[in-house]
A protein has these predicted regions:
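Two-component/phosphorelay signaling modules centered on CheY-like receiver
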Residues: 11-30
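Acidic, metal-coordinating helix/loop segments flanking the phosphotransfer/catalytic sites
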Residues: 31-49
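His-Asp phosphorelay/catalytic-motif detector in bacterial-type signaling
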Residues: 46-48, 73-78
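The feature encodes the CheY-like receiver
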Residues: 57, 75, 87, 106
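C-terminal output helix
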Residues: 107-116
Length: 134
């Protein structure tokens, strides 16, 4: 059962991402409204996929990607960046930091589902052990 962490400061956007991915069989979703909250969640629970915005009020998406890639237990966690920043510099920076895919808003449900399916099929069963960490 894929565990997905959806991080965006917009509740509407988080709900839209969840609605787009809900048809993915047996997925379970956790939502975070900031980069700091995302990092807290990532230290508490194992996830199979991280869907992340770049623009957030405290810790930005790039910094969250850098945190994930700096952790041995999280290094293989697939990350989809979903952002309004469609410029090439943002795309390059996100991918260089370690994002798996970069998508711009607006996106279609099919494109997000396809990206998630592709990454989940390639990923190891869990990026972390099932046990919570302290």
């Amino acid at each position: 059962m894929p565990e997905v962490l959806v991080v965006d400061d917009s509740k509407v956007m988080r709900e839209m991402v969840v609605a787009c991915l809900r048809p993915y069989p047996d997925s379970r979703f956790t939502q975070a409204s900031s980069g700091l909250e995302a990092i807290e969640q990532l230290t508490l629970k194992a996830y199979d996929l991280l869907v992340l915005d770049l623009n957030m009020p405290d810790i930005g998406g790039i910094e969250v990607v850098e945190f994930v890639r700096g952790q041995d237990q999280l290094r293989s966690l697939p990350i989809i960046i979903v952002t309004t920043r469609g410029d090439e510099a943002s795309r390059e920076r996100a991918l260089q930091a370690g994002a798996s895919l970069f998508m711009t808003k607006p996106f279609t449900p099919d494109s997000l589902q396809g990206a998630a399916r592709s990454l989940l099929e390639k990923a190891p069963a869990k990026a972390l052990d099932e046990a919570p960490r302290g």
